[in-house]
Amino acid sequence: MITFCISTYNNLEYLKIAVDSVRRNSYYKNSPFIIHAENCTDGTDEWLKENYERYSLNCYLDKNEVPLGIGGGMNFCADKVQTEYIMFLHSDFYVTPNWDKALMDTHNKYPNEKLWVNSHRVEPQMFPDSQSRPGTIVVAKETFGAYHNDFKSVLFDKYAELFTSENDFEIPKGEGVSGLIKKEHWDEIGGNDPLFAPASWDDMDLFLRMLQSGFRFILPTTSLIWHFGARGSHRLEENNNQSSERQMRAEFNNSQKWFSKWGGPPVFDEYEMIKGIEQ
Protein backbone atom coordinates (compact mmCIF):
# COMPACT_ATOMS: atom_id res chain seq x y z
CA MET A 1 0.00 0.00 0.00
CA ILE A 2 2.67 2.54 1.10
CA THR A 3 6.38 2.91 0.44
CA PHE A 4 8.35 5.10 2.84
CA CYS A 5 11.03 7.20 1.12
CA ILE A 6 13.93 9.22 2.54
CA SER A 7 16.68 10.99 0.63
CA THR A 8 19.61 12.01 2.81
CA TYR A 9 22.99 13.73 2.72
CA ASN A 10 25.46 13.47 5.64
CA ASN A 11 22.80 13.37 8.34
CA LEU A 12 23.57 10.04 9.99
CA GLU A 13 22.64 10.61 13.64
CA TYR A 14 19.24 12.02 12.69
CA LEU A 15 18.69 9.41 9.98
CA LYS A 16 19.09 6.71 12.64
CA ILE A 17 16.29 8.29 14.67
CA ALA A 18 14.05 8.70 11.63
CA VAL A 19 14.46 5.12 10.41
CA ASP A 20 13.96 3.61 13.85
CA SER A 21 10.85 5.69 14.53
CA VAL A 22 9.27 4.74 11.19
CA ARG A 23 9.75 1.03 11.84
CA ARG A 24 8.67 1.31 15.47
CA ASN A 25 5.80 3.80 15.37
CA SER A 26 4.17 3.41 11.97
CA TYR A 27 0.86 1.61 11.56
CA TYR A 28 2.12 0.28 8.22
CA LYS A 29 5.49 -0.49 9.77
CA ASN A 30 6.27 -3.43 7.50
CA SER A 31 5.88 -1.46 4.28
CA PRO A 32 8.75 -1.09 1.79
CA PHE A 33 11.28 1.56 2.85
CA ILE A 34 13.63 3.19 0.35
CA ILE A 35 16.69 5.19 1.43
CA HIS A 36 18.60 7.29 -1.09
CA ALA A 37 21.96 8.37 0.38
CA GLU A 38 23.79 10.83 -1.86
CA ASN A 39 27.48 11.72 -1.60
CA CYS A 40 27.61 10.81 2.09
CA THR A 41 30.97 10.94 3.87
CA ASP A 42 29.83 10.80 7.51
CA GLY A 43 29.41 7.05 7.87
CA THR A 44 25.87 6.92 6.47
CA ASP A 45 26.79 4.44 3.74
CA GLU A 46 28.51 2.14 6.20
CA TRP A 47 25.61 2.30 8.68
CA LEU A 48 23.10 1.47 5.96
CA LYS A 49 25.18 -1.49 4.81
CA GLU A 50 25.27 -2.77 8.39
CA ASN A 51 21.60 -2.15 9.20
CA TYR A 52 19.57 -2.55 6.02
CA GLU A 53 18.49 -6.07 6.98
CA ARG A 54 17.62 -5.07 10.54
CA TYR A 55 15.27 -2.36 9.30
CA SER A 56 14.33 -4.05 6.01
CA LEU A 57 15.60 -1.16 3.89
CA ASN A 58 16.13 -0.84 0.16
CA CYS A 59 19.25 1.34 0.08
CA TYR A 60 20.78 3.23 -2.81
CA LEU A 61 24.23 4.68 -2.13
CA ASP A 62 24.53 7.32 -4.82
CA LYS A 63 27.54 9.37 -5.92
CA ASN A 64 26.93 12.37 -8.17
CA GLU A 65 29.31 15.13 -9.19
CA VAL A 66 26.26 17.34 -9.68
CA PRO A 67 24.08 16.58 -6.63
CA LEU A 68 20.44 15.65 -7.04
CA GLY A 69 19.70 17.12 -3.61
CA ILE A 70 16.59 16.38 -1.56
CA GLY A 71 14.14 17.13 -4.36
CA GLY A 72 16.04 15.05 -6.88
CA GLY A 73 16.41 12.34 -4.27
CA MET A 74 12.63 12.28 -3.87
CA ASN A 75 12.34 11.76 -7.62
CA PHE A 76 14.94 8.99 -7.45
CA CYS A 77 13.02 7.18 -4.70
CA ALA A 78 9.64 7.66 -6.37
CA ASP A 79 10.90 6.00 -9.53
CA LYS A 80 11.59 2.86 -7.46
CA VAL A 81 8.16 2.75 -5.79
CA GLN A 82 5.81 -0.08 -6.76
CA THR A 83 3.01 0.55 -4.27
CA GLU A 84 -0.11 2.68 -4.71
CA TYR A 85 1.09 5.37 -2.29
CA ILE A 86 4.37 7.15 -1.60
CA MET A 87 5.17 8.50 1.86
CA PHE A 88 8.04 10.98 1.69
CA LEU A 89 10.01 11.89 4.83
CA HIS A 90 13.03 13.97 5.70
CA SER A 91 15.97 12.39 7.48
CA ASP A 92 15.61 14.81 10.42
CA PHE A 93 12.11 13.64 11.42
CA TYR A 94 10.86 11.56 14.31
CA VAL A 95 7.40 10.10 13.70
CA THR A 96 4.89 9.35 16.44
CA PRO A 97 2.62 6.31 16.78
CA ASN A 98 0.18 5.82 13.90
CA TRP A 99 1.20 9.05 12.17
CA ASP A 100 0.91 7.28 8.81
CA LYS A 101 -2.54 5.80 9.45
CA ALA A 102 -3.86 9.27 10.28
CA LEU A 103 -2.60 10.55 6.93
CA MET A 104 -4.10 7.58 5.10
CA ASP A 105 -7.42 8.07 6.90
CA THR A 106 -7.41 11.69 5.77
CA HIS A 107 -6.58 10.65 2.22
CA ASN A 108 -9.46 8.15 2.20
CA LYS A 109 -11.95 10.90 3.06
CA TYR A 110 -11.46 12.40 -0.40
CA PRO A 111 -11.31 9.39 -2.75
CA ASN A 112 -11.95 11.31 -5.96
CA GLU A 113 -9.39 14.09 -5.50
CA LYS A 114 -5.70 14.47 -6.18
CA LEU A 115 -4.14 15.07 -2.76
CA TRP A 116 -0.94 16.01 -1.00
CA VAL A 117 -1.42 15.23 2.71
CA ASN A 118 1.09 16.33 5.37
CA SER A 119 1.64 15.78 9.07
CA HIS A 120 1.40 18.56 11.63
CA ARG A 121 4.87 19.16 13.03
CA VAL A 122 6.64 20.39 16.12
CA GLU A 123 10.20 21.70 15.99
CA PRO A 124 12.71 23.39 18.32
CA GLN A 125 13.54 27.05 17.91
CA MET A 126 16.81 26.64 16.04
CA PHE A 127 16.70 30.12 14.52
CA PRO A 128 16.19 33.25 16.67
CA ASP A 129 13.33 34.50 14.51
CA SER A 130 11.52 31.15 14.24
CA GLN A 131 7.83 31.40 15.09
CA SER A 132 4.90 29.01 15.03
CA ARG A 133 2.86 29.06 11.84
CA PRO A 134 -0.14 27.13 10.56
CA GLY A 135 0.82 23.46 10.69
CA THR A 136 4.08 23.98 12.59
CA ILE A 137 4.52 24.52 16.34
CA VAL A 138 7.86 26.00 17.41
CA VAL A 139 8.92 25.26 20.98
CA ALA A 140 11.89 26.16 23.17
CA LYS A 141 14.89 23.87 22.73
CA GLU A 142 14.64 22.54 26.26
CA THR A 143 11.00 21.42 25.86
CA PHE A 144 11.78 18.14 24.10
CA GLY A 145 15.47 18.60 23.38
CA ALA A 146 16.89 19.92 20.15
CA TYR A 147 19.61 17.49 19.12
CA HIS A 148 19.96 13.79 18.40
CA ASN A 149 21.60 13.21 21.78
CA ASP A 150 19.06 15.01 23.98
CA PHE A 151 15.73 14.37 22.25
CA LYS A 152 13.03 13.25 24.71
CA SER A 153 11.11 10.83 22.52
CA VAL A 154 9.00 9.30 25.30
CA LEU A 155 7.86 12.73 26.47
CA PHE A 156 7.13 13.80 22.91
CA ASP A 157 5.07 10.66 22.27
CA LYS A 158 2.94 11.54 25.29
CA TYR A 159 2.53 15.09 23.99
CA ALA A 160 1.60 13.75 20.55
CA GLU A 161 -1.03 11.42 21.99
CA LEU A 162 -2.64 14.32 23.84
CA PHE A 163 -2.36 16.75 20.91
CA THR A 164 -3.85 14.42 18.31
CA SER A 165 -6.70 13.34 20.60
CA GLU A 166 -7.67 16.91 21.51
CA ASN A 167 -7.36 18.42 18.03
CA ASP A 168 -9.17 17.35 14.90
CA PHE A 169 -9.11 19.92 12.13
CA GLU A 170 -7.52 20.29 8.72
CA ILE A 171 -5.44 23.13 7.35
CA PRO A 172 -5.58 23.67 3.56
CA LYS A 173 -1.83 23.80 3.21
CA GLY A 174 1.09 21.85 1.83
CA GLU A 175 4.35 21.49 3.73
CA GLY A 176 7.59 19.83 2.87
CA VAL A 177 7.59 16.13 3.59
CA SER A 178 6.24 14.06 5.35
CA GLY A 179 3.88 13.95 2.43
CA LEU A 180 1.48 11.22 1.37
CA ILE A 181 0.58 11.09 -2.31
CA LYS A 182 -0.60 8.50 -4.79
CA LYS A 183 2.21 7.28 -7.00
CA GLU A 184 0.14 7.92 -10.13
CA HIS A 185 -0.42 11.54 -9.10
CA TRP A 186 3.28 12.07 -8.36
CA ASP A 187 4.11 10.72 -11.79
CA GLU A 188 1.42 12.88 -13.39
CA ILE A 189 2.87 16.09 -11.94
CA GLY A 190 6.42 15.03 -12.81
CA GLY A 191 7.89 15.27 -9.31
CA ASN A 192 10.40 17.96 -8.37
CA ASP A 193 11.96 20.11 -11.07
CA PRO A 194 15.71 19.34 -11.37
CA LEU A 195 16.17 23.05 -12.08
CA PHE A 196 16.14 23.68 -8.32
CA ALA A 197 18.68 21.03 -7.29
CA PRO A 198 20.21 20.58 -4.80
CA ALA A 199 17.87 22.53 -2.47
CA SER A 200 15.53 25.49 -1.93
CA TRP A 201 12.46 26.78 -3.79
CA ASP A 202 11.66 23.29 -5.08
CA ASP A 203 8.73 22.83 -2.64
CA MET A 204 7.06 26.02 -3.81
CA ASP A 205 7.60 25.14 -7.43
CA LEU A 206 6.09 21.69 -6.89
CA PHE A 207 3.11 23.07 -4.96
CA LEU A 208 2.40 25.75 -7.55
CA ARG A 209 2.36 23.17 -10.33
CA MET A 210 0.11 20.98 -8.19
CA LEU A 211 -2.29 23.87 -7.60
CA GLN A 212 -2.45 24.55 -11.31
CA SER A 213 -3.21 20.86 -11.89
CA GLY A 214 -6.11 20.73 -9.43
CA PHE A 215 -4.44 19.17 -6.39
CA ARG A 216 -5.88 19.66 -2.92
CA PHE A 217 -3.57 20.17 0.07
CA ILE A 218 -4.53 18.91 3.52
CA LEU A 219 -2.59 19.15 6.78
CA PRO A 220 -4.51 17.35 9.57
CA THR A 221 -3.83 17.64 13.29
CA THR A 222 -4.34 13.90 13.74
CA SER A 223 -0.83 13.12 12.46
CA LEU A 224 2.09 14.62 14.37
CA ILE A 225 5.83 14.43 13.79
CA TRP A 226 8.92 16.00 15.34
CA HIS A 227 11.15 17.98 12.99
CA PHE A 228 14.64 18.64 14.30
CA GLY A 229 14.70 21.77 12.17
CA ALA A 230 16.53 21.95 8.84
CA ARG A 231 19.37 19.63 9.90
CA GLY A 232 19.36 17.87 6.55
CA SER A 233 19.82 21.03 4.50
CA HIS A 234 21.13 23.90 6.64
CA ARG A 235 23.75 21.75 8.45
CA LEU A 236 23.39 23.77 11.66
CA GLU A 237 25.63 21.72 13.92
CA GLU A 238 28.50 21.82 11.47
CA ASN A 239 28.35 25.61 11.14
CA ASN A 240 27.81 27.04 14.64
CA ASN A 241 24.03 27.17 14.14
CA GLN A 242 24.40 29.03 10.84
CA SER A 243 23.05 27.81 7.50
CA SER A 244 25.62 25.98 5.40
CA GLU A 245 27.38 27.66 2.51
CA ARG A 246 25.79 25.13 0.15
CA GLN A 247 22.32 26.01 1.43
CA MET A 248 22.81 29.77 1.26
CA ARG A 249 24.27 29.53 -2.23
CA ALA A 250 21.37 27.33 -3.36
CA GLU A 251 18.79 29.72 -1.89
CA PHE A 252 20.28 32.66 -3.79
CA ASN A 253 20.77 30.82 -7.06
CA ASN A 254 17.35 29.21 -6.99
CA SER A 255 15.61 32.50 -6.27
CA GLN A 256 17.02 33.70 -9.58
CA LYS A 257 15.90 30.50 -11.30
CA TRP A 258 12.43 30.94 -9.84
CA PHE A 259 12.03 34.38 -11.38
CA SER A 260 13.33 33.10 -14.71
CA LYS A 261 10.82 30.25 -14.69
CA TRP A 262 7.74 31.94 -13.25
CA GLY A 263 8.31 35.61 -14.03
CA GLY A 264 7.48 37.01 -10.60
CA PRO A 265 7.56 36.47 -6.84
CA PRO A 266 5.26 33.94 -5.14
CA VAL A 267 2.06 35.10 -3.44
CA PHE A 268 0.87 33.41 -0.24
CA ASP A 269 -2.50 33.01 1.48
CA GLU A 270 -3.38 33.38 5.16
CA TYR A 271 -1.93 29.93 5.90
CA GLU A 272 1.43 30.90 4.35
CA MET A 273 0.67 28.56 1.44
CA ILE A 274 1.64 29.62 -2.07
CA LYS A 275 -1.42 30.55 -4.12
CA GLY A 276 0.06 32.08 -7.25
CA ILE A 277 2.48 34.55 -8.80
CA GLU A 278 2.44 38.30 -8.25
CA GLN A 279 1.42 40.00 -11.46
Language model: regions and residue ranges:
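A conserved acidic beta->alpha catalytic loop
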Residues: 37-46
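Conserved donor NDP-sugar-binding/catalytic core segment of glycosyltransferases
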Residues: 94-147
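A short, conserved alpha-helix in the catalytic core of glycosyltransferases
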Residues: 103, 172-190, 195-224
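Active-site-adjacent helix/loop segment of glycosyltransferases
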Residues: 125, 131, 207-279
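Glycine-rich, basic loop-to-helix element that forms the pyrophosphate-binding segment
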Residues: 64-81
